[in-house]
Structure formats: structure tokens, C-alpha cells
């Protein structure tokens, strides 16, 4: 609603990354008060659109972590502005490789967790052949599904990250809904 953010503090500021606001308690915060835990009381459906990415100046909705919020629903009030950093072409390639390695491992771990009971059964029976077969099946499934979560930069993303900067590790993970058009030099 109009005026909601008037007088609200940016409670989370991380150099070369982002600044975040949205905690209504920040309007009456005392010095030293820990902020960031409260919000407006509702979430919004995720609207993650690949053409909107985390270049410098983008506004995006904050949210709880995937383990708590697998649907990636956005906070109804918390948002952040990307500060980010500028990457050289070589460094952006290294960053994308690191991001994709993490995403691959996370996907494999989720699939493995879904088979926890089966794994335990084979372990208790000392059935190492079945464990190896299951591991191969999980690895194959991970490779097949990975293409859906793999970060692939477009030419526009690569140009932005190597000129104005940003935070590519957030791409495909959060709802981007706006962009600062002037005033980022503050």
C-alpha cells in the first residue's frame, strides 16, 4: 500500500552484493536492534522469469531459503537492490562454473534424500551392488534434470556482468520486479 516504506530502514547492507529493506519494525528501531525477521505477514507467488536477471540496480523480492520455502514464494514486503560487482570475462566463467557445480550437487543431494529409505535398506543389508546401481541411477537422473537448473548466461547477461556488474548467482532463484533508473551512485 502507498506509504508503506516511508521511514523504513535498509536493515541489511552487504558491500558489492545488495541492500535490503522491508522489515516494518525498522520504522521504530532502537540503535542496535536486530532487524529483518518481521514482514507484512503474507507471501507472493514466485515469478522467476529468465529474461530478468540480477544486474546492478535490479529490485528483487527477498524470500526464505529453499529448504523452508521450496516454492520460492517471495516476501510480501522485503526486497533488495542489487549492488553486485563487475566481473572480467574469465572470472564470470569461473563464477558460472562454481554456481553450476553447487546446483548440480544440490540437485543430486535432493534426489538422494528422496531415496533415503532405500539407501538405508541396502546399507543395512550390506548390498553394495544395489547401492552402486542406485547411485548410478541417481547420477543419471541428476545429469538429465540438471539442464533445467543449469545457469547459462545470455549475451545480454554477460555484457551486463562485465560492464555494470551484478550478482549472477541469484539468477533463476528470486523474483526480479524492477530496476533503479537513477541514483545508484549514492
Predicted regions and their residues:
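Cyclophilin-like peptidyl-prolyl cis-trans isomerases
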Residues: 1-186
